[in-house]
Every structure is written in C-alpha cells, then in structure tokens.
C-alpha cells in the first residue's frame, strides 16, 4: 500500500509537518526505502517504528512499545541491541524481508559541535541486506554458495542470459541458457534471490520459479535492464573503455551483468567488493539435471530440504569451508567434457596413490581459514583484525603444505599437481605486513582498540603508554613538583569540575613562587593550581583512547588496502586450497569405502560391475549391514533395461544408484563399484515416486505426465533416463498404454540409455520386437507364504507383484490379509491366465471371477468391485488401496 503512495500522501499519513526533527529524519529515510524494513540506529539500539515495528515484533518475538503520537494514534516502536543485530537479522532474512540498516554517521558530540545541543545526529542507510547480498558468516551457510542472480529474457526468447554472483566470495559468472533449460539452470544454482523484469511478473516463467522452485524473485522496472545503461555500469565498474574487455558476450549478457552490478551498488551503497571480470561459461559444459531429478536423487539436499541423507552429506569429508563449497559446486555441475573429467580423475588417482600425503595435507588444511570470505569482508570495510590474522596463518600453513609435496617428490611432481600447488609458495611481503602490524589478540570490533602492534607505529605506542601508565605519569609529575616547591604534602587530584589540579595546604602557599603554577581555586584550607604541563598531560590522558582508536583505524585501513592489492593472488590461493581439499576428500572416500576409478568412452557404454548406492550403503553400515551390489550393462545394443519385480525389492535403489554413479564419476571422483566404464552422460532425467501436488492443483498422475513429457522433449542420445512406475496414477489400461508408448519412443526416437522399472508385467513382451530392450527382475526366494527379497538384479521378467506380501510387511491386520488372499485366489481361478496381454480383447470380455450370490448390499458391492480387477496386474500400491476399499465395504 505504501509503495503506491506519493510523497505528499506519505507525509500526510504520518503527520510529517508536526513530527519531531528526529522522527522527520526517520520518515525521510523510510520514504526512500519503502520496500524495506528500516532498522534505525539510536544509541545502543536499532529501533523500528510504525508498521515496521508491528511486523518485526511478530517475526522476532520482541516486545512492542510506543514512542509519542502520530495525530491521535500512538507510534508503535520496538528495538534490538546493536551488538546482537546479526541474531535478529537471521530471522528477518529467513522470513524473506529486505532490511535497510540506518547507522549514525557521527557521534552526539560531533552533532552538538556542528549544530548545537538541539542538532539531530546525522544518519543514513549504509546498506540494504537481502537474501542474495549477505556476507555475514552467521547469516549464510558456510559450505554452499549464496548466489544473487539476474535473469534477462531477450525478445526472441530462445536463449536467456543469466549472471550470478556470490558476494561473500566475489565469484561472478555469466551464461547463456536455452529457454527450455532456465528452470533446470536455476535449480542447479539455487540462488537466494533472482532479479527479474517487472514485465515478467505475470509470466509462466515467474510463476514456475516461485511455485516449482520456491525461489525469491525481486522485480525491477524494465529500464533497470536497459542495454546502454548496463554497458555503462560495467565499463565504469571495471574501469574499461570497451565492453570487449569482458570477452565475447551478447547484449542480454551485458544486461544481466550490468543489472547485477547495479543492484549490488544500490544495496551496498557503492561499497561493492573487488569483483573479478565475470567468468563466461558454456551451458553444455556441464551435465543437465532438471529440478525434479535433483529432488528425486537428493544430490545436495534431502527430500525435506535438509542435508542429512543427501549425496553431498555422504561424500563430504572435506575439512575446510571453501572445500565444502567447491564440492557442492562439483556435485551441482558434473562435467561433460571427457578431457576435463579425466584431468580431475588423474588428480584424484594421484592422491589415492599417495594416501600418506593425503593424511598430512588434510591435517594441515584444518589450520587454514576461509580466506575467500575474509577477503570479501576486507574489501567491503566490514572486517576485523582476525580476518587479517586468518590470512596470515593460512599463508604460513600453505607453505608447509607445499613442503609436504616437496619432501615426497622433490621437483618430480606431475604437471597437473604442480599447477594446483603453485600458489602455495606464499607471499612473504603480505605475510610480513600482517605479522608486523596486527596483534595476535586483536579484537573483533575495531572500536575496542588494541588491534595494531605498538612497535609498528610510535604514536600508537605512545598513546597506549598513556592509557596503560597514566597514573604513573601523574605520580612522576607530582614528585617533580614536590622537589621544585619543597612541599612534601603536594598532591595531584581530580574532580569533575576542574579536572586534574595541584593541591597544597593554605600554609604552604608562600612556597609557590614559579609563575608556571596557575591559580585555579581556593578553599578554606587548600589552594589549587594547574600548569601548562599538567593541562597537556590531562588532555592527552582524556583523549588517548579516542585518538588511538582513530589512529588504529587509519592504519588498519591502509593495511587492508595493501591486502586488497593482493586480492588476485589470495583468490588463487583459496582456489588451490579448496581444490586440494576436494581431491584429498575424493582419495579419502575412495580408500575408506572401496571406490574405483571409472573409465570414460565416447559411445553409449554404461558398464557398471558390482555397483552400490553410496548413501544407502553408508546407512546400512551404521547398522552393521551389507549392501547388495548389482551390475548394470547398457550399451548401443542394449540401451534399455525393463525391470519388473515387487516393491521393497530394490528397484528404485538400483535406478538411483546408477544415476548417482554417473554423477559421481563426472565430477572427477572414484565410484562405488568394482569397475565402471561410462560413455559421457550429457543429461540425467528421473521420474521416481512423485507425490500429489495438490497445492499446485496437480494430481500424482498429472505431475507424472508433466515430468515424463519434459524428459521426452529434452533428452538426447547421450542422456540417461531412469523411470519408475510410469502410468501408475491412472487406470491399468491407460497406464499400460502410456508406459508402452513411452518405451517405444525412447527406443525408436531418442535411442538413449534408460532404466525403466514397472509393475506392468505386460510390458515384458516388448523385448520380442524392440531389439535394444532387455528384461530384468529382482531375485526373490519363496518359502510357503513367505518371500525373501534378495535385492539382486537378474535377467528375466517377474510374473507377480507380491502386493499382498508387501501389505503384510506394512502391518495390515491378519484378517485383512487373509481375506485379501481369498479374494486373490478367486481372481486367479477365473482370470484370463498368466502370460496373456492385458490389452487383448479376450481379457477385456471375460468375467474375472464369480462369487456366490448374496442378497446383502455388501455382497453386491463386492461383486461389482471384483468384476473390474485382474489380480495378476495389481501393483503393491493398488493391492494396498484395494484392501482399504474392501475394509470400508465390509
């Protein structure tokens, strides 16, 4: 509502003309930031007023008070202590609010000197915090990026441009994305905030970003993305004369980069960190994994959005924050270039062959710091001495790490390892700068003082000497004056009226002969004096704390500017350390969990021997259980495996594990298998176990069909498709028909690798006329009424779904199971016979079974229900649903 009001209307609403000067100052700043919660610094608190206060008190759970009146209404107010700001910011950002931080730009004393005792302290917004522009360690995840993205859709709409930046690490990248892949690319990046033109607010794209991905969108007017404006912003920011200095980029990429830089300028109030020139990447240089597949495979998060049980949590044994972020990026963006994949695998193999080196390096890496984010805080003037010390300790440790390699290999390291560790040589000049200037016990807050070593600057030493030894200097001066006057009882005292003074008894007044003693005050029994020397000492003592903090800030700023000059080197060092962490991590898990180096080919091979699901295997190990490994042999001649068998037997796990093995291999890691030979996968698609999406108005079947449609439209010959129970959400006949036609399309048109699990046993006959399709099933053992799932994939087809066995395992009452068995027996006696196709006209015309007529309504309903069911075709889910229906009828 406020955003739609003009300035005059706003002033009228808040009775601006009769408000106090301080409240007018608040309103002026609030009117300029209507889309933000305004935190207004007043002394030791950040205060909020009016609607902001009401909203914040609810979100933060703090007391709502009042301050004065707005006409007849009292002004709502709440506040938070300045030193606890980050704790409250976390809640506001998590609630998706933009927060404007308004700070005092001068002290109350400075305000009085400027405009008298009625002067209002100067305040202004120093930055705007949004989900995509956070740099505070406590507000962002340490082991994953925090991206702000700008998405620009050109008029032809065939290719969009996306620029994304992580302000906390100064990473900035731009990429062109096909229109059909926009959601998939956003799912890969998981940006905390997306800039989008206001013209797209009502578009299907914006709706999908918000509803399907649940990402925050910040809309900007269309002119925000204007090409001429954005080009000028880029040239000014990078101090260039020609946009070609960025590289070969399109007009829409210019708009994406420029809009990101402009947004950072607006939110950071010109205080943007030193960003490198944007890295231009090609969209097809990494594997496409759509958002549904990322969710189904639980790559970086589990199905609830947490980390436990995800592939990332299983593979992540990194020991540094930046290493954790790099692994996150690797898993989000597996490579598709064989040469680059093999380059990574060679690095992993080197460390796997040198596990003693790995052990030493991992211990040393634990002593390094997240210098990427330290550097960003330094460049944005939000650092502390501890950030500089972190850089110093990391420089020191880096040289020790390089020594580990030298001790083991001397000058005979492979070139690809030498390239990684080259930045570890350190920078003696930078190390010495920090070592000579910053105290080891430097505080977090510059205003506390004590950050600069005393010996670095004589004035700092002098001021700290005054602070620490002020009483001693007063005592020395007192002793000097006693000698000069001969008055042994002379004292130097202090009060709040005249400050420091020389105090003698009245009977000794005749001994004060030197004119340097200036009379200040006479009492009944005492006379008080001062001297220029005492006044100077007093002034120095009073101002020493303020002066030393001011001087230390100046020196600290100068030191930081020298550190910033080394930004490029520090980023290379951070990259080297994070790379070492990730590849040592790969070697560690390969050794710990018996992973093997995969081999890559340029054909459609997918030859996995004794493959395992890493997440499930780790969970079983915690229970002292073993994972049952399985082979998978896909090729040009055998591209599709049609897998039948009961639920709980391991079909879904088998499907997922092979997709995961492809992902792990293409990030450069060894894989959980005895051997692996893989033709590079350009895209992975999965459709596994979709739940009803009633909020979005989509049933299970509709969600399934939408996902399947997208898979068929976007897959290529080099893709890997895993499908589980396609067609299950509709009638049996419809489901079989859809699954049948989907398989034909994949076989005849796409000709890509596919694992297809189903309960529709009728589909197994397709192997008779689709040469690249083969039937596989899950091995089981039957003992009377009991079955044992062996979890082995074997050649052949299942002839039953074992739905009632699954229902029994689920804990249905024995009476229900027994009754279901009786009904199933009736089905089997009167069914069309095993092995016949459900699509045959005979099966459509035959009555399924006959029940003894009964005059009751229940019997009639049962008869009607059973007449529509073929028991051989029941999936476990359908059998379970049938049991519930029978229970209701009975």
Curated annotation (Swiss-Prot):
It holds the Pfam family MutS_V. Signal peptide: none annotated. CDD domains: ABC_MutS1. GO terms for molecular function: ATP binding; ATP-dependent DNA damage sensor activity; damaged DNA binding; mismatched DNA binding. One of its GO terms (biological process) is mismatch repair. It comes from the Bacteria. Keywords: ATP-binding, DNA damage, DNA repair, DNA-binding, Nucleotide-binding. Disulfide bonds: none annotated. ATP binds at residues 645-652. InterPro entries: DNA_mismatch_repair_MutS, DNA_mismatch_repair_MutS-lik_N, DNA_mismatch_repair_MutS/MSH, DNA_mismatch_repair_MutS_C, DNA_mismatch_repair_MutS_clamp, DNA_mismatch_repair_MutS_core, DNA_mismatch_repair_MutS_N, DNA_mismatch_repair_MutS_sf. This protein is involved in the repair of mismatches in DNA. It is possible that it carries out the mismatch recognition step. This protein has a weak ATPase activity. Belongs to the DNA mismatch repair MutS family. NCBIfam families: mutS1 (TIGR01070), PRK05399.1 (NF003810). This is DNA mismatch repair protein MutS. It comes from Rickettsia conorii (strain ATCC VR-613 / Malish 7). The gene is mutS.
